């Protein structure tokens, strides 16, 4: 089984603490978090609405199809692709291992994969969660050290791309 996620939700899942648009959205997101924490399911990248969006699709104000959200997905896809050293496209599967989550959270805290966050209504909440070392997150574990100065993480070994410009593994 897989959890279907659109690219910008790769970022949202890093700071999810149980807040959301509606109670139905939060209940659904909590179910997705439980599935990811069980470690038995991979993430499959999708274009458009995903398993997290299901909690909103029945709402009259669902924004999952808006052009701004599609652009947010593209910015997230590009920044996470650069971090991971591979091109992420629909159908790509990722495993939410502890190492994957730490790498993503370190990059998020350092601002290296936050391009998609511009204009998001949740940005201040996510800033606070990242600054706290990701305390209270519902997917994975918080970072072991509180990131008082997130920029110091930009040289962390886990942030090095898997593949260099030669295309070979480091």
Regions found by a protein language model. Give the residues of each.
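Long, hydrophobic N-terminal alpha-helical segment
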Residues: 1-38
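Local cysteine-cluster metal-coordination motifs and their immediate loop/turn environment
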Residues: 8-20, 47-67, 114-130
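Cys/His-clustered metal-coordination modules, chiefly Zn-binding fingers
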Residues: 84-149, 153-159
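Mid-chain, well-packed structural core segment of small domains
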Residues: 61-99
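PIN/NYN-family metal-dependent endoribonuclease catalytic core
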Residues: 40-48
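Short, mixed-charge aromatic SLiMs
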Residues: 35-41, 146-149
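N-terminal amphipathic/hydrophobic targeting modules at extreme N-termini
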Residues: 158-161, 170
């Amino acid at each position: 089984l897989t959890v279907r996620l659109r690219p910008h939700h790769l970022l949202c899942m890093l700071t999810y603490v149980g807040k959301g648009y509606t109670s139905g959205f939060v209940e659904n997101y909590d179910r997705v978090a439980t599935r990811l924490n069980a470690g038995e399911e991979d993430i499959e990248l999708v274009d458009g609405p995903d398993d997290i969006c299901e909690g909103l699709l029945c709402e009259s104000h669902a924004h999952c199809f808006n052009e701004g959200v599609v652009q947010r997905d593209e910015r997230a896809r590009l920044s996470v692709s650069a971090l991971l050293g591979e091109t992420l496209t629909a159908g790509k599967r990722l495993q939410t291992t502890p190492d994957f989550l730490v790498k993503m959270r370190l990059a998020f805290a350092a601002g290296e994969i936050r391009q998609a966050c511009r204009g998001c209504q949740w940005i201040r909440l996510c800033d606070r969660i990242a600054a706290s070392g990701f305390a209270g997150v519902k997917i994975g574990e918080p970072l072991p050290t509180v990131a008082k100065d997130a920029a110091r993480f930009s040289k962390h070994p886990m942030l090095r791309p898997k593949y260099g410009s030669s295309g070979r593994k480091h």
